[in-house]
């Protein structure tokens, strides 16, 4: 599992936003709103395991292992 850190979270956030700029057949506004909503929802997590789980979920989504929204 990826170690949680502020830098890792920000890096994931930026990578997801960059990926969103390349979307063709999907509503970009919906994609960006979904990314922002998920990050804000998990912003106040205090449990280290929960943070790492959410970071891992984001990395899996970024790498397309769950299917991309394209």
UniProtKB/Swiss-Prot annotation:
Annotated GO MF terms: mitochondrial large ribosomal subunit binding
Keywords, in A-Z order: Mitochondrion, Ribosome biogenesis, Translation regulation
One of the GO biological process terms: mitochondrial respiratory chain complex I assembly
Motif (LYR motif): 12-14
One GO term describing the cellular component: mitochondrial matrix
Function noted in UniProt: Assembly factor involved in the biogenesis of the mitochondrial-specific ribosomes (mitoribosomes). Specifically associates with intermediates of the mitochondrial ribosome large subunit (mt-LSU) and is required for proper ribosome assembly, possibly preventing premature association of the large and small ribosomal subunits. Thereby, indirectly regulates mitochondrial translation. It is also required for complete assembly of the mitochondrial respiratory chain complex I. May also function in DNM1L-mediated mitochondrial fission.
Subunit and interaction comment: Interacts with intermediates of the mitochondrial ribosome large subunit (mt-LSU) (via MALSU1 as part of a complex that also contains NDUFAB1); regulates mitochondrial ribosomes assembly. Interacts with MRPL4. Interacts with MRPS27.
Domain commentary: The LYR motif mediates interaction with NDUFAB1 and is required for the function in mitochondrial fission.
The protein, known as: Mitochondrial ribosome and complex I assembly factor AltMIEF1
Organism encoding this protein: Homo sapiens
